[in-house]
Design a protein with these regions (language model features):
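Glycine-rich, charged/polar anion/phosphate-binding loops
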Residues: 16-19, 25-30, 48-51, 104, ...
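Conserved small/polar residues in nucleotide/adenosyl-binding loops
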Residues: 194-198
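Short, Gly/Pro- and small/polar-rich lid/capping loops
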Residues: 1-26, 33
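A short glycine/serine-rich beta->alpha loop
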Residues: 82-87, 120-129
Length: 198
C-alpha cells in the first residue's frame, strides 16, 4: 500500500469527528468532520406531514433532507442555489440520497404525524460531502429522536438501525478508501457506499 498526499494508507479513513449541539435551535445538530470536510447537519421537527400523505391517508410521519454547499465551502466561491432558482442537479441528487438513506433507519409510522427535516450545509468541502452528510445526519437524527422520546412525544423508539457511508475509488490504478477532493477529482472510478447495521 502506498502513502497518500495526506499521509494515509490506501485503506485508511480520514480523521472523523462529530461535534454535538453545534447549533442550539434544532432538535438535533452536529458538525460532521471528515478530514477537512465539515458539514453542519441539523434535524428540525414539524408537527405535520406532506400533503400527499394526508391525501392518501398514509399513516405515520416523513423524513426529508435538504443539502447545499455554502458559498465559501470551496476555494472558488459558489453562488447560493437560492440565487439560481433552487437546488441544482447535484444538490438534488445528494439530498434525495441522504433522505432515502436515513429513511431506512427509521420506523416512520412510529414517528407519528411529523416531518423530520434533515438539513445538511457544507461549510468546507474536501471530498466526501455526501458521506459526511449521511453520517452526520444519522447522528443528528438519533439526537432528535431521543429528545422527542424524552419529551413524551413518542411512545416507542422509532430508530430501527443506524446507517453510515463511505467513499472508495481507484486513483492511478490503486484502490483507495475515503477520497479527499484531490483524489476524487483524479479518480478513474469512484463510488459511495451506505451500510445499515443489523
Amino acid at each position: 500500500m502506498s502513502q497518500r498526499a495526506d499521509g494515509r494508507s490506501s485503506d485508511e479513513l480520514r480523521p472523523v469527528r462529530f461535534v454535538r449541539d453545534f447549533q442550539a435551535s434544532p432538535a438535533g445538530a452536529v458538525l460532521a468532520q471528515f478530514g477537512k470536510t465539515r458539514v453542519l447537519c441539523a434535524v428540525s421537527v414539524v408537527d405535520s406531514v406532506p400533503r400527499w400523505m394526508r391525501e392518501q391517508n398514509v399513516p405515520g410521519g416523513w423524513l426529508t433532507s435538504e443539502y447545499q454547499m455554502l458559498p465559501g465551502a470551496t476555494p472558488e466561491r459558489t453562488t447560493r442555489e437560492s440565487r439560481r432558482g433552487g437546488p441544482g442537479g447535484r444538490s438534488s441528487e445528494i439530498q434525495r440520497l441522504v433522505g432515502r438513506s436515513l429513511r431506512m433507519a427509521v420506523d416512520l409510522e412510529a414517528v407519528g404525524p411529523r416531518t423530520l427535516y434533515v438539513d445538511c450545509d457544507v461549510l468546507d468541502a474536501d471530498g466526501g460531502t455526501r458521506c459526511a452528510s449521511i453520517c452526520g445526519g444519522m447522528v443528528a437524527l438519533e439526537i432528535a429522536l431521543r429528545k422527542l422520546r424524552a419529551a413524551g412525544k413518542l411512545s416507542t423508539d422509532p430508530l430501527r438501525r443506524r446507517i453510515a457511508a463511505v467513499s472508495a475509488g481507484v486513483v492511478a490504478g490503486e484502490s483507495m478508501l475515503d477520497l479527499c477532493y484531490e483524489e476524487d477529482s483524479a479518480a478513474e472510478v469512484d463510488r459511495k457506499s451506505t451500510r445499515l447495521n443489523s
